[in-house]
């Protein structure tokens, strides 16, 4: 779908790799994604883990920003890694998944719950209807939980911004890059 090419050798690559090393972020490569073929949207991210970690920059990002601004964007992305945001979000998703499975198991066995909804008396025959009810109810729960997810997301973004500010010895490159992103 998207093509990834290694970032050309030169000053930009040297600056970005130096920043990553300074932050203690080991990346195998820096790659450029051909995002301009589908959109004018700009982005940067890291993918992989251990010795297979890669930094990916959209070609649009490289075209729109000065090297110092690109460093600030990369510092922000590294901030997500250093602050442990990915494992925290994965753990939260796993927790919600476990709660969902627990509810399915518990409510499938509940004669009171199933009886009030007119479901079968045999526990094996209740799984489908209970799953259907919980699937519909999940939409209601996620509607009410969405503000908390947004709050957590904003908290993580502010933490990554603070990390980038500290890495860049001030807020100006980050502010400038964020203005160009939006």
Where do the protein language model's features map onto the residues?
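Polar-ligand-bearing catalytic/cofactor-coordination segments
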Residues: 1-125, 139-182
């Amino acid at each position: 779908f998207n093509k990834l090419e290694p970032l050309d050798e030169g000053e930009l690559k040297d600056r970005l790799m130096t920043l990553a090393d300074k932050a203690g972020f080991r990346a195998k490569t820096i790659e450029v994604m051909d995002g301009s073929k589908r959109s004018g949207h700009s982005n940067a991210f890291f993918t992989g883990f251990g010795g297979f970690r890669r930094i990916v920059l959209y070609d649009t990002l490289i075209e729109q920003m000065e090297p110092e601004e690109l460093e600030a964007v990369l510092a922000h992305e590294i901030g997500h890694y250093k602050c442990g945001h990915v494992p925290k979000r994965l753990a939260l998703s796993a927790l919600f998944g476990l709660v969902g499975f627990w509810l399915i198991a518990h409510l499938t066995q509940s004669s009171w719950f199933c009886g009030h909804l007119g479901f079968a008396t045999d526990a094996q025959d209740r799984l489908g209807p209970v799953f259907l009810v919980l699937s519909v109810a999940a939409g209601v729960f996620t509607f009410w939980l969405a503000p908390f997810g947004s709050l957590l997301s904003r908290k993580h973004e502010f933490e990554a911004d603070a990390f980038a500010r500290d890495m860049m010895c001030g807020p100006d490159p980050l502010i400038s890059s964020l203005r160009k992103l939006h």
